[in-house]
Amino acid sequence: MIQLRDIDKYIDKRFQRTFILKGINLDIEEGEFVTIMGPSGAGKSTLLNILGFLDDASEGEYTFLGETVHNLSEKKKSEYHKSHIGFVFQAYHLIDELTVYENIEMPLLYRKVKSKQRKAMVADILDRFNIVAKKDLFPPQLSGGQQQVVGVARAIIGSPKLLLADEPTGNLHSEQSEQIMDMFKKLNDDGVTIIQVTHSEKMAAYGNRIINLKDGALVKEDPYNQAVES
């Protein structure tokens, strides 16, 4: 699904080049649940943004679903992002002026899905995530955990092949974190490829593989074969 070859990301300033990522080589197969870990400033979020077409590598080759990303037009990149990739952020990124229903519906509006189909898809996702009773509320009326559930629902309503999550449980307490991660595990069991960034070993254990970054470079990979204990 994903191949990264010699990926560099750097900033040139006053005749000095500062590397954020350097020499990243990585393959991720469809259906994996991968965790990216490392200290602050290691380049984790930058790598996630490159994978999600929110940023471009300075050097190297990124292949997604058989397409070489740097050869794609901006329009094509946007289409791939909307059609195949869902994003979940630590800071929810919900629109306070829109209801839960309207926030979840938004990706379908961008994709010009017809009204009747939109209504059916939103109704299905509200039911699936047990938030039908919250559909007319606004984000400030929800708890942090409830807002993140809405964020996950919005991210997957278009049935993405790839879900990217940047510290998805960073602002949540333990019970809420486990709820979100159980949700991710079920999505992964249903075939969604997931790549998450987290500092938490406990949250990392939900995946099957850990990628460690330090100073922008890949340090080592750990298979995570043990089941998460309930």
Task: Go through each PLM region and give its residues.
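ABC family nucleotide-binding domain
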Residues: 2-209
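Conserved beta-strand-loop-alpha-helix hinge in the C-terminal portion
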Residues: 209, 217-230
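A cytosolic small-molecule/anion-sensing beta-strand core signal
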Residues: 214
